Curated annotation (Swiss-Prot):
Major site of localization recorded for this protein: cytoplasm
CDD domains in alphabetical order: Hsp33
Classification of source organism: Bacteria, Bacillati, Mycoplasmatota, Mollicutes, Acholeplasmatales
Biological processes per GO annotation: protein refolding
Source organism superkingdom: Bacteria
Regions crossing the membrane: none
Pfam families cross-referenced by the UniProt entry: HSP33
Organism listed in the record: Acholeplasma laidlawii (strain PG-8A)
Compartments in which it is found: Cytoplasm
Protein name per Swiss-Prot or TrEMBL: 33 kDa chaperonin
Gene: hslO
Intrachain S-S bonds: C236-C238, C269-C272
Role summary: Redox regulated molecular chaperone. Protects both thermally unfolding and oxidatively damaged proteins from irreversible aggregation. Plays an important role in the bacterial defense system toward oxidative stress.
Length: 290
């Protein structure tokens, strides 16, 4: 099944709901970055939330989202536009679980991310706007909920989940974002709060093979009207030419130093780990163009 997001209105158009399945793109990220389970869960939640956020803007803004925590994962970055995402992670080799309590043995994403900030930069026709908020728990969903309330002034509830197998493969990923519209009544808010309180976790919904359609029915108490469906995917978009052009922008001295010291240039894409080699002939062409 392809990854996709549904956008719906519910409760007499008082609530907007986004629901997603993102298993394929999160698994692709895991393979590209070789993440261990807790890093996979953190990155997967971040990718899913970012993909949904990118569908909220109709003018084609490219979003760059960063979670900069003091936990072992370090900084994570996602670029997102119209449901297409790519990501980087500073330390993919993180496998932390709860050692005690009711969550014993489960992935401890909050500790892996730590304290820090969530920032969002919107690139609209090369005009850049950045807003940020402090991380609340490092669990990603809570952090996006707080971001929407403080930076976008949009009361929201964000639920995210990633299920990783014992073999480290991502077997389910998805989530939802609920946005309260300005004219929502107290009755609707109470009803919605009651429904959300009965959901143990998004992971439980995913384990039960609930689709985005099912999630809308549950969250909307069967009042949802689906308006849009968007495919989600992980796509890097890098190419040999793009990195050739980037290298060519180095000054002549820097290029000559690379040529004389290394004889070639090696570039590794941080979003997909693809390696590009530029030979002495390539470097000579770049130098000659100066």
């Amino acid at each position: 099944m392809k990854d996709y997001t549904l956008i719906a209105l519910a409760y007499n158009q008082e609530i907007r709901i986004y629901t997603s399945v993102s298993t394929n793109l999160v698994e692709k990220s895991r393979k590209l970055h070789k993440t261990l389970p807790t890093a996979s869960a953190a990155m997967g939640r971040f990718l899913t939330a970012s993909a949904m956020m990118s569908l909220m803007y109709k003018d084609g803004e490219r979003l760059t989202l960063k979670i900069d925590g003091d936990g072992p994962i370090g900084q994570m970055t996602v670029e997102a536009k119209n449901g297409v995402v790519r990501s980087t992670i500073l330390n993919p080799n993180v496998y932390l679980v709860y050692g005690e309590g009711p969550k014993m043995g489960k992935l401890n994403v909050g500790a892996a991310v730590g304290a820090g900030t969530l920032s969002v930069t919107k690139d609209w026709k090369e005009n850049y706007f950045t807003s940020s908020s402090p991380l609340q728990t490092g669990e990603i969903g809570d952090d996006f909920t707080y971001y929407y309330a403080t930076s976008e002034q949009t009361p929201s509830a964000v639920g995210l989940g990633v299920l990783v197998s014992r073999g480290k493969k991502v077997i389910q990923a998805g989530g939802f974002i609920i946005q309260v519209l300005p004219h929502a009544s107290e009755k609707t808010l109470n009803q919605l709060e009651s429904i959300i309180s009965k959901i143990n976790s998004v992971t439980d919904l995913l384990k039960s093979n609930h689709t985005p359609e099912d999630m809308i029915n549950i969250l909307s108490d069967n009042t949802g009207e689906i308006l849009e469906k968007h495919e989600l995917k992980y796509h890097c978009g890098c190419s040999r030419k793009k990195y050739f052009d980037a290298l060519s922008r180095l000054n002549k001295q820097a290029l000559e130093d690379i040529l004389h010291e290394d004889g070639q240039a090696e570039v590794v894409c941080q979003y997909c780990n693809k390696k590009y080699i530029y030979t002495s002939e390539d470097l000579t062409k770049m130098i000659a163009s100066k």
